[in-house]
Amino acid sequence: MGSVQDENKDEFKQSLTRGKLKPSSSSSFRLRSPSLNSIRLRRIFDVFDRNHDCLISVEELSQALNLLGLDADLSEIESMVKLHIKPENTGLRFEDFETLHRSLNDVFFGSKCEDKLGLNPDPAQDESDLKEAFDVFDENGDGFISAKELQVVLEKLGLPEGSEIDRVEMMISSVEQDHDGRVDFFEFKDMMRTVIVPS
């Protein structure tokens, strides 16, 4: 016998798959390493929590999704948030956000994906994921990430590093090896491999 909450979750999952957000075969947003998963989710939570009250409100979640180009209906977001918070809270605490993330992983990628937990790492898939991430930053498709392109993405994500071009240029120069002021895919891969260490 299913509860009203289970019915609401099923209804929300169906509305997601009917809307703009579709299940994808890409695993770019599946975080495989459990320890990195929690760290990354915490960083995302902190970015979404604009007023730093340790809660993500419906409005904050809506703004974050819009900045990422994922236009979602406000009433659907409100329904989703209500499914994952305790009645006395006005928004998602970090623990609620983790639960929401797990449920969205189940909707989009299936709950039986072993590689979601890092059990079946696939180097070819990792390479594909890195290329996909690189392409997000390489807005003009020239095969390089310029300081301006990096700044645009950081600003869209609401990260403070994107506010000053000097800071962005320093980030680029710390990664690029041939001193041309931009990052190619191989430099990007090296950077990501030094940042993401298997647990």
From Swiss-Prot:
UniProt: Ca(2+) binding residues: 49, 51, 53, 60, 138, 140, 142, 149, 178, 180, 182, 187
One annotated GO molecular function: calcium ion binding
InterPro entries per UniProt: EF-hand-dom_pair (IPR011992), EF_Hand_1_Ca_BS (IPR018247), EF_hand_dom (IPR002048), EF_hand_pair_protein_CML-like (IPR039647)
SMART domains, sorted: EFh (SM00054)
Biased segments, Basic and acidic residues type: 1-13
The keyword Calcium is assigned to this record: yes
PROSITE patterns: EF_HAND_1 (PS00018), EF_HAND_2 (PS50222)
Gene3D superfamilies xref list: EF-hand (1.10.238.10)
Residue ranges occupied by any EF-hand domain in the UniProt entry: 36-71, 75-110, 125-160, 163-198
Keyword vocabulary terms for this entry: Calcium, Metal-binding, Repeat
Region Disordered: start-end pairs: 1-31
Function comment: Not known. Probably binds 3 calcium ions.
Protein name, UniProt field: Calcium-binding protein CAST
Upper classification of the organism: Eukaryota, Viridiplantae, Streptophyta, Embryophyta, Tracheophyta
